[in-house]
A protein has these predicted regions:
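Nucleic-acid endonuclease domains
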Residues: 1-11, 17-131
Length: 131
């Protein structure tokens, strides 16, 4: 795994996913949480180097949180962008507002950012990068 999930327009982006319904628990809904723990080290695929940080940190510039809303989750609705909600948050916001917190839930995401649909992700990433 690289230090971040993808690079776009010079930005390092971490993508986190969860769902209201999980394949291992179709009878009930889950309480989605996303891991945001600061890391002590990171691997960079481009150079095949491990970097050890003096202080744990989040390597991305921006986080994109993706929540699959449909229940039950099916192959069809998981592939449908309309079944998902997205929150795009600058890492600096996570650092300032949540500090060393290692995970985040939906209510906190709603406090930090407005959800966007699939077509709004690119603009939201660009806005978050300016923060």
């Amino acid at each position: 795994m690289d230090a971040v999930d993808l690079h776009f327009d010079g930005l390092a982006i971490e993508v986190k996913t969860s769902g209201v319904s999980q394949t291992w628990n179709q009878s009930g809904s889950s309480t989605p949480r996303f891991g945001i723990a600061r890391q002590k080290r990171a691997w960079f695929a481009k150079t095949d180097d491990w970097v050890v940080y003096d202080e744990p940190k989040r390597s991305a510039d921006v986080y994109v949180f993706c929540l699959h809303q449909s229940a039950p989750a099916t192959n069809e609705n998981v592939a449908d962008p309309e079944s998902w909600s997205f929150w795009v948050i600058a890492t600096s916001t996570l650092d300032n507002e949540l500090g060393d917190q290692s995970s985040v839930g939906i209510s906190t995401l709603d406090q930090l950012a407005e959800p966007v649909d699939w077509s709004g992700i690119k603009a939201a990433v660009q806005r978050a990068a300016r923060r």
